[in-house]
Amino acid sequence: MKIVIAPDSFKESLSAEKCCQAIKAGFSTLFPDANYICLPIADGGEGTVDAMVAATGGNIVTLEVCGPMGEKVNAFYGLTGDGKTAVIEMAAASGLMLVAPEKRNPLLASSFGTGELIRHALDNDIRHIILGIGGSATVDGGMGMAQALGVRFLDADGQALAANGGNLARVASIEMDECDPRLANCHIEVACDVDNPLVGARGAAAVFGPQKGATPEMVEELEQGLQNYARVLQQQTEINVCQMAGGGAAGGMGIAAAVFLNADIKPGIEIVLNAVNLAQAVQGAALVITGEGRIDSQTAGGKAPLGVASVAKQFNVPVIGIAGVLGDGVEVVHQYGIDAVFSILPRLAPLAEVLASGETNLFNSARNIACAIKIGQGIKN
C-alpha cells in the first residue's frame, strides 16, 4: 500500500518536513509495511526553500548579500537534488523580518540582495530558478533586483539612481544593455499568489505599502513614483505593465521579474507541485495526506492542501487533510477534493502550549486516523 504524505508547514510550530515525519510515524504504528512517500511542500512563500530541498534531497547555499536597508545580511537559497534548479525566497535577502519595526521605510528599502541571490545562482550554472516573492520589505518596483543584474536606472540628467522606492519618481530612462546575458538562457518562474496590479487602488503602494511601514504620505509618494516608473517601462518595452496581473506583488517585484527576467508568473503551489513531481508520486497511491496550520474557507482560494487535492483527484485517490485548527467554512474544501479533515488539537490550551506540542499532537492524530482506517477495513456491509 502506497501512502503519499504532502503537507505544508504548520507555521510557528512545525516545518513541512517535520510534519511529514510525524504523520508517517503515526501511520506506521498501524501500517508498518506501507510504502510512504514524503513530499514536504509549500505555496511559494516562507518555507518554500526548506520544503523543496527536503522533497528533492537538495542542499542550502548560504552567502552574504545586501539587505533591504543597505546592511549586509546572511541569506540563502536552495538547490534541488538534481542540482539543476535554484529555489530563492525574496524574503531571505529583502524580507520585512530583516528590518526592525522602527526602521522600516519602503522609500529607502531596496531589493538589491534578491538580485545578488539570482546572480549567484547564475554563477553556479543554474538555468532554472523558482523565485518566491512573498514577505518583502520593499516597494521599489524591483529596481534593486534589476540593478544587481546590470540594469541601470537614470534620472533626467543621465545620472545613475540608487535603487529604492524613493527614487521611483526620478527614473527618466532605463539602460538594459548590460543586463546579465545569462538570463536569456535561464527559465525563471515567479511564485505569486496575488493578482494585484502595479498601480492604483489595488496596487503595490496602496495595498502593500502600509504592511511594510509606509505612512499615508509615503503611500502617496510611492504611488506617484510607481506611476512614473510604469510610464518609463511602458515607453521602453511596449509592455502594458499597469494591467499585468501580479505586477504589484512584493512591491512591484512581479513586474520587474516579468520585464527584466522574462519570468513566468504563476501560482506558487502550481510551481512547487510540478517541481516535486507530485503527480508521479500520487499514481497508484491508496491515500494522500496533506495539511497545514489552518484549514478553513480560505483554503479553497488556492492554498497548498487544495493544490495537493487537485492532483490526487486526477488519479481518483482519496485525500485526508490534517490541520492545527479547522476554521469557519471548512466544509467547502470537500467540494475541491479533500474528503475528510481533522484537527490535531486534543483540548483548548494557550497558544504557546499548542505550538510547542505540535509534533506530539500531529503524531497522535495521525495514529488515530490510521486506527479509524484500520477499523474501516475490517467492517463489512
Curated annotation (Swiss-Prot):
Optimum pH is 7.0-7.6. Inhibited by EDTA, p-hydroxy-mercuribenzoate and iodoacetate but not by NaF. Pathway: Organic acid metabolism; glycolate degradation; 3-phospho-D-glycerate from glycolate: step 4/4. GO terms for biological process: glycolate catabolic process; glyoxylate catabolic process; organic acid phosphorylation. Divalent metal cations; Mg(2+) and Co(2+) are better than Mn(2+), Fe(2+) or Ca(2+). The keyword rRNA-binding does not apply. Its cofactor is Mg(2+); Co(2+); Mn(2+); Fe(2+). Disruption phenotype: Loss of glycerate kinase activity. It is an enzyme of class 2 (transferase). GK1 has a half-life of 92 minutes while GK2 has a half-life of 11 minutes at 49 degrees Celsius. NCBIfam families: glycerate kinase, PRK09932.1. Belongs to the glycerate kinase type-1 family. This is Glycerate 3-kinase. It comes from Escherichia coli (strain K12).
